[in-house]
Amino acid sequence: MSEIVDIHAREIIDSRGNPTVEAEVTLASGVMGRAAVPSGASTGAREAIELRDDDVRYGGKGVRKAVGHVNGEIREALLGMKATDLAAVDGRMIELDGTPNKSRLGANALLAVSMATAHANAADAGMPLYRHLGGEEAVTLPVPMMNIVNGGAHADNSVDMQEFMILPVGASSIAEAVRYGAEVFHALKKVLHKRGSSTAVGDEGGFAPDLPSNEAAIEVILEAIDKAGFKAGQDIWLGLDCASSEFHKDGKYVLASEGKSFDAAGFVDYLAGWVNQYPILTIEDGMAEDDWAGWKLLTEKLGGKVQLVGDDLFVTNTEILKEGIDKHIANSILIKLNQIGTVSETLAAIHMAHKAGYTAVISHRSGETEDVTIADLSVATQAGQIKTGSLSRSDRVAKYNQLIRIEEALGSAARYAGRGAFKQLG
């Protein structure tokens, strides 16, 4: 009774007020799986292509074309297929699209159906998605990377770097980790208010204050950690997403807010100075996606001290990840479902990373919905780490709440990844 008997997609709205694709897959047993795809603000040049309408509706960002592909070609091709063979379903859609980057039908069309099929399979098996994808061994709750200060493409302020995160590695459970994060978030709001800084939030729910420098963002977070009663470098560590491709111009790393410009070696030294001075545990996209020589320098200098995550660098693509592994570039990959466009390919990237000794961080996008698939995915794959924003905005909090539910359902079997998620903490 696992045959696909119906597929339907619609245009819905994401957390930034832009359209996105939601799909429903119905099986012969009568169960239905539903999923909605996210969308990024800063995107890697080699990501799978998100199909937009480019007409007058929604400033050109409508997704009627992608929805039409789901309700037409994709539906016709998949009706009657066994949903339980997700790899075959995904493979059929990839074959149908016929392009290397899913540009004909749209990665947003393929991913909506792929995710919905996974949900339908889980419902048909009478189990939660994390158990269906991960089996009995899926008991590890991830350390959240909580983006509490937003800059770069995620905020309208003068901070160059995109995300300043807190990692509650010292918590004993995901529920406690969320509490740590929420208490620091509220303490930070008070710190910023006292300074006369804006407490408006960015796309991912973090504050987006105008600060005199990127380093000032670290300083206010450390103050908030202390005021909340936690110890930085023990209870809570720091993480950065530089999104360096966004300020890499003509071979230079240009921090406009500080009036500074660096070559690759200089920017590596700049980041190394921060690592030596602050309790930084992870740096994402420390170098630009096309600066592989710079990445090599960064990995050689800091790879033994901190987690170096490739996002725009690897774009959840196994071919690019393999090249990085072979060249000893970075030591971690950010996993975004919509960068590659199917669940099967996403799982393959996670498997490749883990096999090579790289960590895998499951991630949201800046444009999200109430869909919580990534929470289940983080547990299913035992990734040990998740990025899903700050402690505000329901599109972010929905994922934390799902992790709390999963932890409760697992009961005594549940394990919080904590310090064990990071080799750098021994």
Curated annotation (Swiss-Prot):
Broad class of the protein's primary localization: cytoplasm
Annotated compartments: Cytoplasm; Secreted; Cell surface
Pathway: Carbohydrate degradation; glycolysis; pyruvate from D-glyceraldehyde 3-phosphate: step 4/5
Pfam annotation, one family: Enolase_C
Cofactor note as given: Binds a second Mg(2+) ion via substrate during catalysis.
Family annotation (SUPFAM superfamilies): Enolase C-terminal domain-like, Enolase N-terminal domain-like
Residues annotated as catalytic: 204, 336
GO molecular function: magnesium ion binding; phosphopyruvate hydratase activity
Residues given in the record as (2R)-2-phosphoglycerate binding sites: 162, 336, 365-366, 387
Names of required cofactors: Mg(2+)
Its EC number(s): 4.2.1.11
Purpose of the protein: Catalyzes the reversible conversion of 2-phosphoglycerate (2-PG) into phosphoenolpyruvate (PEP). It is essential for the degradation of carbohydrates via glycolysis.
Subunit structure: Component of the RNA degradosome, a multiprotein complex involved in RNA processing and mRNA degradation.
Family under the similarity heading: Belongs to the enolase family.
NCBIfam families reported for this sequence: eno
Name of this protein: Enolase
